[in-house]
Amino acid sequence: VLGGDECDINEHPFLAFLYSHGYFCGLTLINQEWVVTAAHCDSTNFQMQLGVHSKKVLNEDEQTRNPKEKFICPNKNMSEVLDKDIMLIKLDKPISNSKHIAPLSLPSNPPSVGSVCRIMGWGSITIPNETYPDVPYCANINLVDYEVCQGAYNGLPAKTTLCAGVLEGGKDTCVGDSGGPLICNGQFQGIVSYGAHSCGQGPKPGIYTNVFDYTDWIQRNIAGNTDATCPP
């Protein structure tokens, strides 16, 4: 996260850390057995750590999990990495809530333009050279009007995405923050998907998967209906 500060150790009990060979992502715990991240964070072999703050100084209640099942939208266009950029993961065993671990529920309402949204992650805090912090960084940005975003990206973002940033630039998610949450007015509204080639370019806000549009798909999969499709 660019332009932020170290997150408070107690403000992100739902934020988890996904790591594989040579890369990592954020993810969000939504209940005792399920987490949500970006589809582009998938790999054949990854582990997830919950209850993490510092990567060097471990919390006593940290828990590590492997994916038991992974779900991406069956109607996702596989040739487009960023189409329907959401993945639902069932953990290999349930998590118990603890001091640094607690889920964030799915949103009950869609987000509104202008909302103040919190971003967080262990991604780079500098550009163009990347610097990865030991603890997650947090910043507040704003939800931007969809049309503004389409203009900035030549019509690229799909309707099931949100745009958020600050127009003067300098505050943004960055490399390594993918898959983490966008929390607007206390609700889990977005998943970090992509952004301008260089993070923090004001006129090009970050692009986030719109969680509200996928709540039905998520709930159906959790209930065992794995044939559920996502919105177009």
From Swiss-Prot:
Coiled coil: none annotated. Disulfide bonds join C7-C138, C25-C41, C73-C230, C117-C184, C149-C163, C174-C199. It is found in: Secreted. GO terms for biological process: proteolysis. It comes from the Eukaryota. GO terms for molecular function: serine-type endopeptidase activity; toxin activity. PROSITE patterns: TRYPSIN_DOM, TRYPSIN_HIS, TRYPSIN_SER. GO terms for cellular component: extracellular region; secretory granule. N-glycosylated. Contains sialic acid residues. Deglycosylation reduces in 50% the formation of fibrin clot. Residues 1-223 form the Peptidase S1 domain. Keywords: Blood coagulation cascade activating toxin, Disulfide bond, Fibrinolytic toxin, Glycoprotein, Hemostasis impairing toxin, Hydrolase, Protease, Secreted, Serine protease, Sialic acid, Toxin. Expressed by the venom gland. It is an enzyme of class 3 (hydrolase). The keyword Signal does not apply. Glycans are attached at N77, N129. Transmembrane segments: none annotated. Its EC number is 3.4.21.-. It holds the Pfam family Trypsin. InterPro entries: Peptidase_S1_PA, Peptidase_S1_PA_chymotrypsin, Peptidase_S1A, Trypsin_dom, TRYPSIN_HIS, TRYPSIN_SER. Belongs to the peptidase S1 family. Snake venom subfamily. Monomer. Thrombin-like enzyme that shows clotting activity upon human plasma. Shows specific fibrinogenolytic activity for Aalpha chain (FGA). Subcutaneous injection into mice induces a mild edema. Intravenous and intramuscular injection reduce plasma fibrinogen concentration and increase the levels of fibrin(ogen) degradation products. This is Thrombin-like enzyme BjussuSP-1.
